[in-house]
Amino acid sequence: MKIDVLTIFPGMFKGPLTESLIGKAIEKEILKINIIDIRSFSKDKHKKVDDKSFGGGCGMVMKLEPLYDAIKSTGVKKKNSTYKNPYTKPYVIYMSPQGRILSDSIVKNLAKFKQLVIICGHYEGVDERTMNYVDEEISIGDYILTGGEIPAMVLIDSTARMLTGVVKEKSSVKNDSFYNNLLDYPHYTRPAVFKGYKIPEVLLSGDHKKISEWRVQESYKRTKERRPDLLKK
């Protein structure tokens, strides 16, 4: 998979994309991430990418021209261009608090695409006409951040985990919280007893069937207690 990230702060991505599983996925060439500086497409001598909002109001708005040129540089065609296989089209995402809340089902679908183009907004957001070139707006929660870079990192990390070869044990992904609309079951490691706190006896039984049943029960119990809304999906 190729991911193009359009941002005015490219330096923010240096650490998160070179460590852990994401860094290894890039080394294995499972994942290719291209950080594109939107300012490099500004025709202003000061590389300005924002301007005042028509109609007045506080805050600045990201200009359309440099955003358009940055988007086109990734190979994106018209928004409604047809492809024999829809997952071969570059899928353009704008990280926005007004978008759909990121979920496991969204991530699974995004992982099917060959190329994602992620736009990171700033200030009061982007010129609304940018939406003519965007396939979907995605949010990571009902709160406001200083920009779209951190949400973009969340999207990249969660999507990359779904790609074959990124997580060594595929079963680890399938047993994670939300994968089947259930939270994950409790995990324990050595020692079996710590300051009087013992792990459940069933985990020491060696009976894989009983262990599996216990995990399903605990997963359901935890979901019912903490996220009952997931059971309604």
Swiss-Prot record:
Molecular function terms from GO: tRNA (guanine(37)-N1)-methyltransferase activity
Residues holding S-adenosyl-L-methionine: 121, 140-145
Pfam families linked to this entry: tRNA_m1G_MT
Subcellular localization, as worded in the UniProt entry: Cytoplasm
KW Transferase (keyword) present: yes
Function according to Swiss-Prot or TrEMBL: Specifically methylates guanosine-37 in various tRNAs.
Family of this protein: Belongs to the RNA methyltransferase TrmD family.
Self-association state and partner proteins as the record states: Homodimer.
Protein name, entry field: tRNA (guanine-N(1)-)-methyltransferase
Organism, as annotated: Endomicrobium trichonymphae
Gene field: trmD
